[in-house]
């Protein structure tokens, strides 16, 4: 009986040791995979390599369509096929009629009007937006002269509202804001030399107004970076 008990303990202990060994092996493989992934990221290749100017139409959920322009700096590759872009852009758009009507209704709901016969007319309102953003773009070469990319990034939006009826009032103060946004991009570059043509669709999710734009522009890639393949080390 004692020998049977000893044999059972031995088998149970053996199974436990095997299980621990398997878990340690899997855990070690996961750590090695994570270390291998992180080792692909490096700051060594980060340096200004190209400058881009773009212009195109933009529309949003609370504004009328207008034009937007931007300036972008390609800051090199932080990982294979992953580059960093720093950008600034600007637009100035009119409030849409529906957005202005909703805003007037919200103001009316907080105004004390005993006779209930007052009306609020804000008139034309414009909203300007200055954005600074950082994008990570995954670059997919399609040949020597064409590059496509997908990107995601974060932006800071400085907005300013203005209009003849609201300037200097609390309404203008309510429209002035600084907020964050999430960017998504898809685009292409065409050209094998220093000068390249760019085409990009960009969507922005942010508080107050979310926008979509289609921009075209030119990029100048200076010497030392034009022949460098995406993601290759120095």
Predicted regions and their residues:
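Outer-membrane beta-barrel "beta-signal"
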Residues: 211-234
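Short glycine/proline- and aromatic-enriched beta-strand/turn motifs that initiate or cap beta-hairpins
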Residues: 33-80, 223, 234
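Residues on the lipid-exposed face of transmembrane beta-strands in outer-membrane beta-barrel proteins
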Residues: 53-57, 69-75, 88, 132-138, ...
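Outer-envelope beta-barrel architecture signal
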Residues: 43-51, 80-84, 144-150, 178, ...
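Structural signature of outer-membrane beta-barrel domains
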Residues: 58-60, 89-95, 155-161, 204-208, ...
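Solvent-exposed loop/turn segments connecting transmembrane beta-strands
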Residues: 57-67, 144, 204-215
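Gram-negative (and chloroplast) outer-membrane scaffold detector with strong preference
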Residues: 72-164
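Extracellular loop and loop/strand-boundary signature of outer-membrane beta-barrel proteins
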Residues: 56-59, 118-123, 168-174, 201-206
């Amino acid at each position: 009986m004692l020998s049977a008990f000893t044999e059972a303990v031995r088998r149970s202990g053996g199974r436990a040791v095997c299980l621990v060994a398997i878990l340690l092996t899997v855990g070690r493989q996961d750590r090695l995979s994570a270390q291998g992934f992180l080792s692909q990221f490096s700051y060594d290749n980060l340096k200004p390599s190209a400058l881009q100017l773009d212009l195109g139409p933009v529309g949003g959920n609370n504004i009328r369509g207008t034009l937007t322009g931007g300036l972008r700096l390609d800051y090199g590759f932080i990982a294979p096929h992953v580059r960093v872009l720093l950008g600034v852009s600007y637009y100035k758009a009119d409030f849409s009629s529906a957005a202005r009507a909703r805003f007037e209704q919200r103001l009316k709901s907080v105004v004390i009007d005993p006779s209930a016969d007052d009306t609020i007319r804000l008139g034309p309102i414009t909203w300007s937006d200055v954005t600074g953003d950082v994008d990570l773009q995954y670059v997919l070469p399609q040949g020597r002269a064409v590059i496509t990319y997908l990107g995601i990034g974060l932006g800071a939006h400085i907005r300013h509202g203005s209009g003849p009826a609201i300037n200097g009032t609390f309404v203008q103060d309510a429209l002035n804001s600084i907020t964050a946004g999430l960017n998504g991009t898809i685009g292409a570059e065409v050209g094998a030399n220093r000068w390249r043509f760019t085409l990009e669709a960009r969507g922005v999710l942010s508080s107050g107004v979310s926008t979509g734009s289609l921009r075209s522009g030119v990029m100048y890639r200076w010497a030392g970076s034009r022949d460098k393949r995406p993601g290759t080390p120095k």
